[in-house]
Amino acid sequence: MKLDIKGSMPKKIDVMELFARDGIQAIDTYLPVETKVWFINEFIACGYKHVEVTNFSHPRFLVQSKDAEEVLAGLKRVEGIHYKTYGMTPAAAKRAVAAREKGHPVDSMALTISAADLHGMRNSGRTRDEYKPEIKEMFNIFKGSGLKLDMAIACVYGSPCDGPVPVENTVDLIKWGLDNGLRDFTPCDTTGESNPVRSYEYMARLVDEFGK
């Protein structure tokens, strides 16, 4: 397939820095609060405008998440920076709202729903349909708080458990999210298997369905 993209590329892109959440969550040795805060501030000083700063998941699953509120308390809001957090449950959503009410820099929280059910079961113990009621509850918790809920969609190209994943799975999840008030979605190439052609075809399908 030959792609003619001359003149259609965006003039700029936004890059989100994920070190303080995704980058260290698999490290078993706990990193102290001051280390995380230092890295976050350094990334902001480098010019990143979107930074994912912490995880509200239970520390029995991820040792790095046991200090979420302390990390947020250690940060001073910088104008023009979007501070993003992560959480998978209504309890996490309540913690994010509480942190924002205390004046800590929290602008949004992401959750992850998998486009492939077997991966979803192994990653979070839920199928897509089983997780949807919790997502609705999280959205309702955020109402009036000023926080945005970002639905990250895992395995949009393929799953290590399920194999190839059709783009229709993404389309169906975004449609459901829109119908239930969500406006922020992040498709994720969890397996790192995409290429320029597949990415173009995938995004073209989403643009055809939802517009730019």
Label every model-predicted segment.
Residues 61-85, 130-150, 199-212:
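Alpha-helix-loop-beta-strand connector modules within alpha/beta enzyme cores
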Residues 49-74, 111-126, 157-161, 186-197:
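Glycine-rich, proline-tolerant flexible connector loops at the mouths of alpha/beta enzymes
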Residues 14-22, 49-53, 81-87, 107-111, ...:
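Hydrophobic faces of well-ordered beta-strands that scaffold small-molecule active sites
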Residues 2-28, 111-123, 144-161:
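N-terminal small/glycine-rich loop or linker at the start of catalytic domains
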Residues 10-52, 64-68, 77-78:
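Conserved N-terminal beta1-alpha1 strand-loop-helix module at the mouth
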Residues 18-37, 82-91, 121-128, 155-169:
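Active-site mouth loops of central-metabolism enzymes
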Residues 64-69, 93-101, 161-173, 195-207:
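Distinct, well-ordered alpha-helical segments
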Residues 4, 33-34, 48-81, 86-109:
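Glycine-rich, positively charged N-terminal anion/phosphate-binding segment
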